[in-house]
Swiss-Prot record:
This is Probable cell division control protein 7 homolog 1. GO terms for cellular component: cytosol; nucleus; protein kinase CK2 complex. Belongs to the protein kinase superfamily. Ser/Thr protein kinase family. CDC7 subfamily. GO terms for biological process: cell division; meiotic cell cycle; regulation of cell cycle. It catalyses: L-seryl-[protein] + ATP = O-phospho-L-seryl-[protein] + ADP + H(+); L-threonyl-[protein] + ATP = O-phospho-L-threonyl-[protein] + ADP + H(+). Serine/threonine-protein kinase. Needed for the initiation of DNA synthesis during mitosis as well as for synaptonemal complex formation and commitment to recombination during meiosis. Its cofactor is Mg(2+). Residues 21-341 form the Protein kinase domain. The gene is CDC7-1. The active site is at D137. It comes from the Eukaryota. ATP binds at I27, G28, E29, G30, S31, F32, S33, V34, V35, K50. Keywords: ATP-binding, Cell cycle, Cell division, Kinase, Magnesium, Meiosis, Metal-binding, Mitosis, Nucleotide-binding, Serine/threonine-protein kinase, Transferase.
Amino acid sequence: MEEEKILESDLRHISFVMPKYTPIEKIGEGSFSVVYKALDAESGRYVALKAITRTSSPARVLDEMMFLKTLGGRKNCMGLLGCFRNEDQVVAVFPYFEPIDFREFISNANLADIKRYLHNLLIAIEHVHSNGIMHRDLKPGNFLYNKESGRGMLIDFGLAQYEEYSEGQHAEGGAKPAGPLLFFNSVVSKTKPPGYYERDGRPPMKAPRAGTRGFRAPEVLFRCQRQTGAIDMWSVGVIFLTILTTQYPFFYSSDDIDSIVEIATIFGHAEMRKAAKFYGRVWRSNIDSIPEERIPFETIVESLNPWAEIGSDGYDLLYRMLDLCSSSRITASDALSHPFFDDLKTHENCA
């Protein structure tokens, strides 16, 4: 993890916790927070201080703290040691966890490393989902992994929601479209092929759009109103594909339209039409770079990383994670029982 020196100006918004915690260095920064490595004066242990920016919604901050409390720091989910408030400044305190840089990890990860990484991540996701929570922003930066110990920690629940919060029905199973027909016919950011797209003059469908570009599930990009924990499993699949191909980020799109087209260049028109119908949408495109039939993941992985050794079980798990239709996408619980992890579980039982 990249570390930065702390400027005096940075300390103003965490000064009220400094009698108890001594900041050492900045270790992360996002849209709504800055994270510091600090020393707990009482215990002598390192902690992580998450200073939440003033622009954050108070309700969102409260929700994040409640989700952390619910998950209880168990099963590879980051625990909350404490939370301090001074007027509109909030600082959350977490155990310090030393991760490996994700790019460094994928550059030399062997099959056993990949299995341990994914297994740790799935344990966390299964725990989150079993409590009725969707993380909604899964990406390598939000899953800290220590290769030496073989342990991981899921962090940042700032965009999490309970599943029942995202209500309304999308048109699953071939129902009539629930809103305007959307025509995704833009250009892919890397290849820039010729193509067209039709704009619908009606107001766009409103739906949750959490997540980071490149990791958003098809139902998020199709703006389906009802979303489930399946969106997290798509993100896990993208992480899996990223590790196998050693291409980070794997998807480069700058907006949702291009993201859909970029996915289509892999899945092809035939599967995109089926997925669009499943979500009550219509798929139409004339972009030459999109094939009629999908490109197998085996072809993609072997072309980008000829040295990858994953086997049929690994590919089967990848296909089931990156299923365009949310209802048939594998769950975290089922993924943990997948044969891909059989030898890992045998090794753990013998340890």
